[in-house]
Each structure stands twice: as C-alpha cells, then as structure tokens.
Amino acid sequence: MKRRIKQGGVCVLAAALMFSVFALPNTYAAPGIETDRECSIEVIAAHDEFSELQNLPITVKLYKVADVAVNGEYTPTEAFQSIDFSDVDSDTVAAVWEEKAALAKEVADTEEVTADAEAVSEEGKALFEAMPTGMYLVDAQPAESDYNTYEFKPYLISLPNNYYYGTGNDEWVYDLTGDNAIGLKPEKSDLYGDLIINKTLEVFNATNEGANFVFQVEATKTDVDTEEVRVVYSNVVSMTFDGTGTDSVKIEKIPAGADVVVTEVYSGANYELTTDAEASTIIIANSEVEVDFSNTHNGGQNGGTGLVNTFTYNDGEWTHSATEDSTP
C-alpha cells in the first residue's frame, strides 16, 4: 500500500549552498497544482568558492521519489516506498530533509534504480526540461579536476516549487531556471600521487662502512581559488648503500598539484654529487613522479654515518623516532 503525506505537505527548495524546506501554512493555501504540467530545472554547478566547477563536466541525476496531487499531497513512487514522509510538515527542519535525501540516495544506489533524467553540466550549468511534477532526488556525481576531487550532497526538490516564505507570493513555480535555479553543495578534497627518489652510486669505497645519503623533502600546494600556499609534506628520508648501483625510496600520498623540492643535504663521508643537489617536480594525481641523484667517491677515507629523525603527530602528541635508512 502506498503511503500518502499528510495534507499541507512540503515543498522543497535547494538554493545554492542551502537546503531549505518551504511549506505553505493553511491560512495561505496556494492554488491547486497543475499535475499534468511540464516543469524544468536548471542546476548550477558553478560555485564562487570553487572556480574549477565552472568547466568540469558534472553528471547530475534526478530520481522521482514521490508523485504530487493537486492539493499538494505526495505519494512515494514504487522504488522509494521505504522512505517515510508521513512525519513531515511545515515545521520539519532541514536536517530531517537531509536525512531523507541521504536515505533516497542509498535506495537509488543499493537498488540500482534507473534515474528519471540525467544531464551533464556545460559551462557550470545542467538543464532538465519536460519534467513531470513530483518530488525528486538531486544526485550529482563526484567529479575530478587535475588535482582535486569534488563530492556533492544529495537533496530533495519539489516540482513545482513555492517561495511563499521568501517572497510572500503563493503561486507555484514550475520552471526552476534563471533566478529560481538550484545550486549544488560541493565539498573539495585532494587527489594524491607518489614521489620516488632515485639514487645512483657510481663508485663505492669498500674500505669504509655503508654510504649514507639524506634528503630533505618539502612539498607545498597553492589553492586554485584562494591562492593560499600550504605545506603538505615536510620530512627527511635516507638511503644506505653497501656497493655501487641504484636504489629508490617512495613517499606515498602527497597531494596532487604540490610543488616538491628534494634536496640532498648529506652525501655521506667521502662522497660527492655528480648531479645537482636539488631537484623539483609536481605531483600528478594517481601517478608516480621521480627525481634522480647520483654520487661518486671522492677518494677520501673519512668515516661517517647518518640518522633520519622522524616526527609523527598522533592523538595530540608528537612522537620521535630515528632510523639509519628510509629505504624499504
């Protein structure tokens, strides 16, 4: 049996970065809904705080979760019968609607429900036309730029919508475009890549013990929107050789787009660089980038060794450890 939302049900408006629930009080009853009228929705993907969204192709899916009657009552569609709308009214807070939107997305994902409409944003906008009246789940899919990933909160939107509390006008709005377009609520996070430091020892002096080499690694990333520069990695790593050859050390999960400077700060007793002491690169998402250093023996006989000090911040405390070699 289909449940019906009690009379005086809800009308949901999702404005840019906002999730608002609008309901007409009984004393301001709106004219009846034209349930056979076609509607349209313009979804604005572009965002003032996240400039990359203007040009990223973002797939937006609409799922019809409920039909609407002339008097504004909603009846859940077959695929979304498990979502209870009977406890909502004009006093329902946004957090409750967010919870119901999350439940609707869970149903859509786990039950592999086919979207009623799908569009890809162009120049920061996705347009849906000829949409039947009802309540819809707006589900924008994650999108990636070169260095960042964006995820979007799902929400519910009513077609038609009503802006009585904002404008005092109780007319139903069937075209949510232009000034009535709806926005997305994005969350930005880093993509990551790995750094590999390659070291080649061309000549080894067997008279001395192992040859130790220490590298200072500094990585900074500039935010594409705020231009704020933040340190995303700062540490030292080392390698120990007991003969000639090439060895490597990998540093994983450095934010993509970070500018990395690797400096060989200790070349071991009696060894000198045959390459520059500093190498730079940019981290690429889901990839490995490499820098290379080479050394040779300088003919000296002085002994020497090296330790790598590592400081780790965990649960409010710094811990320290010292190792002779950072290689696996």
Which sequence ranges carry the predicted segments?
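Solvent-exposed loop/turn and edge beta-strand elements of beta-rich ligand-binding domains
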Residues: M1-P328
